[in-house]
Amino acid sequence: MSWQAYVDDHLMCDIEGHEGHRLTAAAIVGQDGSVWAQSATFPQFKPEEMNGIMTDFNEPGHLAPTGLHLGGTKYMVIQGEAGAVIRGKKGSGGITIKKTGQALVFGIYEEPVTPGQCNMVVERLGDYLLEQGL
């Protein structure tokens, strides 16, 4: 399966039990900042934004004072899982980032999608990739 198929079929799909509800944007990005696959709506990010995200995975709490920035959008960092998941909130939407062995799985959402639904979609794929050694 191509990386693009993972994004299209497992991240940008309808949320279980909520037909028509899906993430706003999603991507799989290598830990070096190279985009493996992304939705058409995923924001163009700056290298320093990706560096900040990787630093937060290695030094949990790094982004808390400044916020998480992606594509020029600032998210308030909320409870995640140190070294494994970063979650951010902005208004009625937010972001979930799951770290795997080699990549980062991104999901961005707006209402009516809930934070929990975004977490479920992103973390399920991230856990699967981890199980596959990726």
Swiss-Prot record:
Motif (Involved in PIP2 interaction): 84-100
Entry keywords, A to Z: Actin-binding, Allergen, Cytoplasm, Cytoskeleton, Disulfide bond, Phosphoprotein
Subcellular location field: Cytoplasm, Cytoskeleton
Main location: cytoplasm
Phosphothreonine found at: 114
Cysteines engaged in disulfide bonds, as pairs: 13-118
Keyword check for Repeat: no
GO terms for cellular component: cell cortex; cytoskeleton
The keyword Disulfide bond is assigned to this record: yes
Protein modification: Phosphorylated by MAP kinases.
InterPro entries in the record: PFN, PFN_euk, PFN_sf, Profilin_CS
GO MF, any single term: actin monomer binding
Function of the molecule: Binds to actin and affects the structure of the cytoskeleton. At high concentrations, profilin prevents the polymerization of actin, whereas it enhances it at low concentrations.
Family: Belongs to the profilin family.
Further comment found in the protein's record: The variability of the residues taking part of IgE-binding epitopes might be responsible of the difference in cross-reactivity among olive pollen cultivars, and between distantly related pollen species, leading to a variable range of allergy reactions among atopic patients.
Quaternary structure (record): Occurs in many kinds of cells as a complex with monomeric actin in a 1:1 ratio.
Name of this chain's protein: Profilin-3
Organism: Olea europaea (Common olive)
